[in-house]
Amino acid sequence: MTVTVKKLIERLKLEIIYANDQLLEKEITTSDISRPGLEMTGYFDYYSPERIQLFGMKEWSYMTKMTAHNRYSVLREMFKKDTPAVIVSRDLPIPEEMVKAAEEEGIALLRSKISTSRLSGSISYYLDALLAERTSVHGVLMDIYGMGVLIQGDSGIGKSETGLELVKRGHRLVADDRVDVYAKDEETLWGEPAEILRHLLEIRGVGIIDVMSLYGASAVKDSSQVQLAIYLENFEAGKVFDRLGNGHEEVEFAGVKVPRIRIPVKTGRNVSVVIEAAAMNHRAKQMGFDATKTFEERLTNLISRNEEMK
């Protein structure tokens, strides 16, 4: 996804000190941020000009102690054509030399009122989400009791219909048919809909329905962490399915592994209720409550007592 300086300004409500239309459309290519400490001393080895340059209180304080000539020289060396923007935090005063260097080198110069740490975190969070490599997967992503559940299965098995039933039961639709997933970090997977499919569900025999229009804003969500994958498959006599819940299957998306549960589907089975139970049970396991382990302990104790009675 393309992220421009203009989008960043609108998202974080940044003040424009200097920028023209061309600079506002400059693309940001990395979520990494540079705090130019050593660079202010004139040390530019390993300098990364393609990063957003963020000036906080320390950088600003050092800069104001420099002579006007040295300040201008260092800033001219720091501001490169590849640099998307320079941002000053805490609403700090901006020296004339910084404005002059930005104008001459063609760099957007911006300012924010919030603290440097909060600003750095907000920039990274926003850019990480938009610049992460995305992978499209087929399925329905639902928010069930606050847990992101990706429902997959063969075509025609009833994924969208199950999603609709879950919406009617008070849960929220994130994406149907095509789910764009991306890794926010090594262990966290997020999913969102394709823009053209946002809030839409396709139901065979009915057509495309707008979930937000029919069920309200509380029935949809723009994105969600993917914490559990559920695979629906046709029930076949003789096929072995996990009945105790002590199996541990995972599926990998965008380099992140997600636990997966296989649920057999057959006529008369209320799949949406089963998925609700699976989501709640998964959350209970994360909190340390494992019904399978409890059952095994009870069974072991019962066997031990029976052995003692012999």
UniProtKB/Swiss-Prot annotation:
One GO biological process term: regulation of carbohydrate metabolic process
Record: residues binding Mg(2+): 160, 202
Pfam families per UniProt: Hpr_kinase_C, Hpr_kinase_N
Active site, UniProt feature: 138, 159, 177 (proton acceptor), 243
Cofactors, names only: Mg(2+)
Transmembrane stretches, start-end: none
Gene Ontology MF terms: ATP binding; magnesium ion binding; phosphorelay sensor kinase activity; protein serine/threonine kinase activity; protein serine/threonine/tyrosine kinase activity
Region (Important for the catalytic mechanism of both phosphorylation and dephosphorylation): 201-210
UniProt keyword annotations, A-Z: ATP-binding, Carbohydrate metabolism, Kinase, Magnesium, Metal-binding, Multifunctional enzyme, Nucleotide-binding, Serine/threonine-protein kinase, Transferase
Region (Important for the catalytic mechanism of dephosphorylation): 264-269
Binding residue positions for ATP: 153-160
Reaction catalysed by this enzyme: [HPr protein]-L-serine + ATP = [HPr protein]-O-phospho-L-serine + ADP + H(+); [HPr protein]-O-phospho-L-serine + phosphate + H(+) = [HPr protein]-L-serine + diphosphate
The EC number(s) this enzyme carries: 2.7.11.-, 2.7.4.-
Top enzyme category: transferase
Comment block on domains: The Walker A ATP-binding motif also binds Pi and PPi.
Subunit structure: Homohexamer.
Family recorded in the similarity comment: Belongs to the HPrK/P family.
Function: Catalyzes the ATP- as well as the pyrophosphate-dependent phosphorylation of a specific serine residue in HPr, a phosphocarrier protein of the phosphoenolpyruvate-dependent sugar phosphotransferase system (PTS). HprK/P also catalyzes the pyrophosphate-producing, inorganic phosphate-dependent dephosphorylation (phosphorolysis) of seryl-phosphorylated HPr (P-Ser-HPr).
Misc remark: Both phosphorylation and phosphorolysis are carried out by the same active site and suggest a common mechanism for both reactions.
Protein's UniProt name: HPr kinase/phosphorylase
Protein encoded by which gene: hprK
